[in-house]
């Protein structure tokens, strides 16, 4: 995010004396530019101005020559000799540019430099060095370590230089004592990625006088050559975009201007280098630094080419299949046909040599070097989507791409090039051409029909019509009309985000002040459906019950792919045919919407287990997507008009069914070791208990039906899974996951799970409150019943028989023993139940309980069950 320097900001807007960075942050946040951080200096003093009294070269055995210097640091900081007199400090310095008579920056013992480098007296090269003459790199001001800072070369006037006295605090000279404000820029406010834009916003916040630098620069910029009949252009430029994204040309303006006879040995002025470094950019060379400085100041990314290496025409085109580019950072990139390129035409082969990835980064060929004397300046306007995609595709988030993808001013190119040309002329003795080439195909801005009443309707603000006009004019809009409260508003060239009336309402609300929007509480409806629907209430009850059971809710992305299908034993090809495929998936390996929650929930469980958490108990509520391959195709609806009821019905008919599901997975230990007993692993009974609790909470009368092994889905254990039924309605599965699934996912053995179709389950409910069974005051009759049954008969089947036969007098039933062995015979098992009978109206006699018992035995015989003696 941009770093804001108050001294630089002063170039464009009046700033009150003594403005602090804290106050600047408060002023900018009023207009939507949030403070990210105020960065303090990494350098602490004492750091002072020193005058080099003498510098004696001393050659060393290693071939290096050091200077033994005496530096006057002022009476406060000078050393004291044996007689008590103040004398210059003795300092060792190895810099080649150290010489007597210079004023330098001296870091004294006690100072701390970047990297926690502490300055203290130390013996070196046979002397005690009592301080250090600092270079830019040592102070964190840049990469220049070829010599120490000579204040004579630091941009001071002659009078200012003479006024620098030994011992004077030097922290402020290279701005080491000044913090920086880092602000957060939203994607729609790309113009504030420049001092020009931030100064404008400071003006909006405080009313301070603001001068747009682009106005004067545009006035000074020469007319393009095509506006001057008979005048040759600097270089021919062609825009040839044969693959525009969404029909939008990748480049609609390309402005080229030449600077000749540039001095390649010219140095970047210290004031500019300081500003670039404080903005977080590296000083490279005057030509490159100028283009970066213009970008930071005005907001127009620029590129400088070595003109002598180029052959016209310059062609802006899309990449061809198989083309490659080596960028300035030395990395080779395989280009996409969506990438926009800057190319030239060697040997008359039009657009055959790639110079750079437009709006992102230049290539190695054509870059400015230490021998460059003639420069081609490029300032263009590129499509936001094109640049954003290229930057992300090649992982090059450059400063230029950050600005282009947020939108750059379409009218700024001449001004930016003029500013760069002036700086190159002033500091590099270059000669700017007066015949730039401007290929300008930018569309004419459309007027927005805006009603003043929209401000009150949308934002609730009562703003006078004249103030509305003033605000829109102040942000740069051209405003016409207004007599009847309606305006024709044309957005300024630097605001591509202003396209609709609601955008203008947002701007007015922003500048009036969000704190001025009245607080109104929307009235609650007093008729019709109020509050949560019955199904919403039931969903909450399900979530509450599972949480009370000790499970933790999880939310996962509803995307699945081949790996998920295979882990659960599904046939990927068959499953894809009935799955909804996403046109632009978030993850390339998960392009389908889930048909069940378990595969996506399993990913979360798997992630926990991989991090060493084996005892996992998670559940998730959400949609699944059941696509019918025979469903009608979803129609393409026309834009700009409201669809008809028939069109909406056709759209709805083509959508997949999206029922609500709840799923849970339990792994590891259900009960850990403790003083009350040993550990117990999770098994199918824990999942069954979770399902029973859900049913009990919402009042559903579920039954568990264990099918034949061949009828169990592949993800479930064939002998330890059951259907969850409500009468004849299938609502889900519960049991243990198949051992193959546990192995594929890395789950512990016997991991259990459940998945219920809540939409189907809720549909079985009457909507009437669950009635609590009346409490009987009569005594209970307790009996234990043990039956011998075939191994194929489930405990649930026998329990249902007992419930049916006992009728209303059955209070409770619990399976307490399952036994197999020689005593019951081969292919048989014994199921023992503890049952309690109690009448709501009388005390059950021995005859009553005996009659109930006989009824149970008779009913059980229908499924082959025999009462054991």
What are these regions (language model features)?
Residues 3, 23, 473-480, 619, ...:
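A carboxyl-terminal module marker
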Residues 3-6, 12, 24-26, 41, ...:
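Glycine/proline-enriched, intrinsically flexible loops and inter-domain linkers
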Residues 43-46, 219-221, 294-296, 490, ...:
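Beta-rich nucleic-acid/ligand-interaction surfaces
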Residues 49-91, 273-274, 278, 291-368:
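Conserved mixed alpha/beta core segments that line enzyme active sites in large multi-domain catalysts
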Residues 128-150, 157-160, 174-175, 179, ...:
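Mobile "lid/hinge" segments at catalytic clefts and subdomain interfaces of large enzymes
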């Amino acid at each position: 995010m941009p770093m804001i320097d108050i001294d630089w900001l002063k170039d464009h807007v009046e700033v009150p004396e003594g403005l602090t960075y804290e106050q600047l942050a408060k002023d900018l946040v009023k207009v939507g530019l949030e403070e990210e951080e105020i960065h303090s200096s990494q350098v602490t003093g004492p750091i002072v101005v020193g005058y080099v009294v003498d510098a004696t070269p001393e050659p060393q055995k290693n071939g290096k020559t050091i200077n033994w210097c005496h530096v006057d640091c002022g009476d406060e900081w000078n050393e004291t000799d044996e007689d008590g007199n103040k004398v210059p400090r003795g300092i060792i310095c190895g810099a080649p540019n150290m010489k007597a008579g210079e004023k330098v920056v001296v870091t004294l013992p006690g100072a701390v430099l970047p990297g926690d480098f502490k300055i203290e007296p130390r013996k070196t090269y046979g002397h005690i060095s009592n301080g250090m003459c600092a270079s830019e790199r040592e102070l964190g001001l840049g990469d220049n370590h070829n010599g120490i800072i000579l204040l004579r070369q630091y941009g001071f006037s002659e009078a200012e230089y003479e006024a620098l006295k030994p011992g004077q605090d030097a922290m402020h000279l290279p701005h080491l004592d000044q913090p920086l404000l880092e602000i957060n820029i939203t994607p729609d406010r790309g113009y504030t990625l420049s001092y020009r834009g931030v100064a404008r916003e400071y003006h909006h916040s405080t009313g301070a006088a603001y001068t747009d630098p682009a106005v004067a620069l545009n006035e000074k910029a020469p007319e393009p050559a095509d506006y001057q009949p008979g005048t040759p252009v600097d270089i021919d430029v062609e825009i040839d975009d044969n693959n525009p994204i969404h029909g939008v040309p990748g480049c609609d303006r390309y402005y080229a201007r030449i600077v000749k006879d540039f001095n390649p040995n010219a140095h970047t002025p210290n004031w500019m280098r300081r500003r670039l470094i404080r903005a977080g950019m590296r000083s490279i060379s005057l030509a490159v630094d100028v283009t970066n400085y213009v970008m930071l100041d005005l907001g127009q990314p620029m590129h400088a080419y070595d003109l002598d290496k180029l052959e016209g025409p310059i062609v802006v085109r899309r990449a061809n299949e198989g083309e490659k580019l080596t960028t300035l950072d030395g990395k080779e990139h395989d280009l996409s046909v969506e990438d926009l390129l800057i190319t030239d035409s060697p040997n008359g082969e039009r657009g055959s040599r790639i110079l750079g990835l437009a709006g992102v980064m230049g290539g190695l060929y054509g870059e400015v070097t230490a021998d460059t004397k003639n420069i081609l300046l490029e300032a263009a306007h590129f499509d936001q989507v094109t640049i954003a995609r290229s930057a992300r595709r090649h992982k090059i988030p450059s400063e230029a791409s950050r600005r282009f993808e947020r939108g750059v001013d379409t009218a700024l190119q001449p001004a930016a090039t003029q500013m760069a040309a002036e700086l190159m002329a002033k500091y590099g003795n270059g000669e700017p051409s007066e015949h730039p080439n401007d290929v300008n195909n930018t569309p004419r801005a459309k007027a927005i029909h805006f009603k003043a009443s929209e401000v009150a309707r949308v934002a609730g603000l009562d703003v006078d019509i004249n103030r509305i006009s003033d605000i829109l004019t102040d942000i740069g809009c051209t405003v016409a009309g207004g007599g009847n409260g309606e305006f024709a508003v044309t957005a300024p060239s630097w605001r591509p985000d202003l396209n609709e009336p609601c955008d203008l309402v947002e701007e007015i609300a922003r500048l009036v002040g969000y704190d001025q929007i009245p607080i109104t509480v929307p009235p609650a409806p007093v008729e019709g459906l109020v509050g949560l629907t019955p199904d919403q209430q039931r969903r909450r009850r399900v979530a509450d019950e599972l949480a009370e059971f000790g499970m933790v809710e999880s939310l996962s992305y509803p995307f699945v792919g081949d790996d998920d299908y295979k882990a659960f034993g599904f046939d990927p090809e068959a499953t894809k045919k009935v799955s909804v495929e996403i046109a632009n998936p978030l993850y390339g390996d998960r392009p389908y919407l889930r048909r069940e929650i378990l595969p996506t929930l399993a990913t979360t469980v798997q992630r926990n287990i991989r991090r060493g958490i084996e005892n996992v108990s998670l559940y998730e509520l959400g949609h699944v997507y059941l696509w019918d391959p025979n469903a009608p195709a979803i129609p393409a609806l026309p834009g700009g008009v409201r669809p008809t009821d028939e069109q909406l019905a056709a759209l709805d008919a083509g959508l997949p069914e999206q029922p609500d599901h709840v799923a849970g997975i339990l792994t590891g230990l259900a009960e850990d070791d403790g003083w009350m007993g040993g550990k117990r692993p999770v098994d199918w009974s824990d999942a069954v208990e979770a399902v029973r609790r859900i049913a009990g909470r919402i009042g559903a009368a579920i039954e568990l039906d264990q099918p034949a092994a061949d009828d169990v889905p592949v993800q479930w254990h064939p002998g330890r899974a059951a259907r969850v039924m409500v009468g004849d309605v299938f609502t889900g599965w519960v049991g243990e996951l198949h051992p193959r699934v546990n192995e594929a996912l890395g789950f512990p053995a016997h991991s259990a799970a459940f998945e219920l179709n809540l939409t189907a389950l809720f549909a079985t409910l009457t909507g009437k409150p669950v009635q609590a069974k009346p409490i009987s005051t009569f005594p209970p009759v307790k009996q234990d019943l043990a039956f011998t049954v075939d191994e194929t008969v489930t405990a649930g089947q026998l329990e249902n028989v007992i419930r049916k036969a006992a009728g209303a007098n059955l209070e409770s039933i619990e399976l307490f023993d399952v036994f197999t062995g020689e005593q019951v015979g081969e292919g048989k098992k014994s199921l023992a139940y503890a049952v309690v009978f109690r009448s709501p109206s009388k005390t059950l006699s021995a005859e009553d309980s005996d009659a109930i018992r006989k009824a149970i035995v008779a009913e059980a015989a229908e499924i082959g069950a025999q009462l054991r003696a």
